[in-house]
């Protein structure tokens, strides 16, 4: 008798729930509670003495790379950064503990959002074993205590579907717009300037930036440029000028990120070329070597 294995790597997902997406009370409740989960202060000025903004960016980039490599749910990374910012807003932390804190925050966020969460052992491997699983588990309890076990934070991803369904967008472009908006949200999470922005504003600005960047026609000719911004602001009850500034800031961060990536690529290519030249010009005669 032959056995047939039908198991696959595909994670089963629930279908979009109309009871949640078509009821404006859900959006209203999200807008009501979202600010409860924001950092209470700009902690680099008044709490942290050892940690600098560039260090946060470095650990955030590392966390994003881990989440991408492990194919985590889109919500895991922004939620982990929310935990990290809220912790740093209340507890002075040494810079040698920052990566450990980042790993703990990913550990907690994946437990909340993933079907199969990240393991402590796997996260320790991503730190080149600079931390031990037991250390991570001990810090998990510390972080939970300082966050008062309030882990179900509202993130920009919670607003995406509510915003998209209220816009007259072509159905064949929805997936592309959603992916671009999710990329912008992840980008915002790596930048401390967005840490104290309401998630609804980041979500709305990301959707606006995605639509403008893709140069899509939004159904009605009247719904473009400033009118699109006004329509988006109305959906999430956001101030139009604040939303416009947020969207411009998102686009600016994107340009900066792309420029940085391009420079790094050029540097890698140039160093590779230099290595090849060095290799080609290596003297083959021992008498040519100047000791």
UniProtKB/Swiss-Prot annotation:
What does the entry's PTM section describe?
Answer: Phosphorylation at Thr-282 by MAP kinases is required for ubiquitination and degradation by the DCX(AMBRA1) complex. Ubiquitinated by the DCX(AMBRA1) complex during the transition from G1 to S cell phase, leading to its degradation: ubiquitination is dependent on Thr-282 phosphorylation. The DCX(AMBRA1) complex represents the major regulator of CCND2 stability during the G1/S transition.
**One BP term from GO:** cell division
Biological function: Regulatory component of the cyclin D2-CDK4 (DC) complex that phosphorylates and inhibits members of the retinoblastoma (RB) protein family including RB1 and regulates the cell-cycle during G(1)/S transition. Phosphorylation of RB1 allows dissociation of the transcription factor E2F from the RB/E2F complex and the subsequent transcription of E2F target genes which are responsible for the progression through the G(1) phase. Hypophosphorylates RB1 in early G(1) phase. Cyclin D-CDK4 complexes are major integrators of various mitogenenic and antimitogenic signals.
Q: Which Gene3D superfamilies match?
A: Cyclin-like
Q: Region Disordered: list its residue ranges.
A: 261-291
What name does this protein carry?
Answer: G1/S-specific cyclin-D2
Against Pfam families, the record matches this protein to: Cyclin_C, Cyclin_N
**UniProtKB keywords:** Cell cycle, Cell division, Cyclin, Cytoplasm, Membrane, Nucleus, Phosphoprotein, Ubl conjugation
Q: Which family does it belong to?
A: Belongs to the cyclin family. Cyclin D subfamily.
Compositional bias (Polar residues): 279-291
Q: Note the CDD domains from the entry.
A: CYCLIN_CCND2_rpt1, CYCLIN_CCND2_rpt2
Gene of this entry: ccnd2
Q: Which SMART domains match?
A: CYCLIN, Cyclin_C
Phosphothreonine: which positions carry it?
282
Subunit comment for this entry? Answer: Interacts with the cdk4 and cdk6 protein kinases to form a serine/threonine kinase holoenzyme complex. The cyclin subunit imparts substrate specificity to the complex.
Q: List the GO cellular component terms.
A: cyclin-dependent protein kinase holoenzyme complex; cytoplasm; microtubule organizing center; nuclear membrane; nucleus
The reply to whether Kinase figures as a keyword in the UniProt entry is: no
The protein's matches in InterPro entries, at most eight in alphabetical order, are given as:
Cyclin, Cyclin-like_dom, Cyclin-like_sf, Cyclin_A/B-like, Cyclin_C-dom, Cyclin_N, Cyclins_cyclin-box
Could you state a single Gene Ontology molecular function term? cyclin-dependent protein serine/threonine kinase regulator activity
Q: Spell out the subcellular localization from the entry.
A: Nucleus; Cytoplasm; Nucleus membrane
């Amino acid at each position: 008798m032959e056995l047939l294995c039908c198991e696959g790597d595909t994670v089963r997902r629930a279908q979009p729930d109309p009871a949640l997406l078509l009821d404006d009370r859900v959006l209203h409740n999200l807008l009501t509670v979202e600010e409860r989960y924001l950092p209470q202060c700009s902690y680099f000025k008044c709490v942290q003495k050892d940690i600098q903004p560039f260090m946060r960016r470095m650990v955030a980039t590392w966390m994003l790379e881990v989440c991408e490599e492990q194919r985590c749910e889109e919500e895991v990374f922004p939620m982990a950064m929310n935990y990290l910012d809220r912790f740093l807003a209340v507890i002075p932390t040494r810079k040698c503990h920052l990566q450990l804190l980042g790993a703990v925050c990913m550990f907690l966020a994946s437990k909340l959002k993933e079907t199969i969460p990240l393991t402590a052992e796997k996260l320790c491997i991503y730190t080149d074993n600079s931390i031990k699983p037991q250390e991570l588990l001990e810090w998990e309890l510390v972080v939970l205590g300082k966050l008062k076990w309030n882990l179900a934070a509202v993130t920009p991803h919670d607003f995406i579907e509510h915003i998209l369904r209220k816009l007259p967008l072509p159905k064949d472009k929805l997936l592309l717009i959603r992916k671009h908006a999710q990329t912008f949200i992840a980008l915002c999470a790596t930048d401390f300037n967005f840490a104290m922005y309401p998630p609804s504003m980041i979500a709305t600005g990301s959707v606006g930036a995605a639509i403008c960047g893709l140069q899509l026609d939004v159904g009605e000719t009247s719904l473009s440029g400033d009118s699109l911004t006004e329509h988006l602001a109305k959906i999430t009850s956001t101030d139009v000028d604040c939303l416009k500034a947020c969207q411009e800031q998102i686009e600016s961060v994107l340009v900066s990120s792309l420029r940085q990536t391009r420079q790094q690529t050029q540097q890698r290519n140039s160093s590779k070329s230099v290595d090849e030249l060095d290799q080609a010009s290596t003297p083959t005669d021992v008498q040519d070597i100047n000791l």
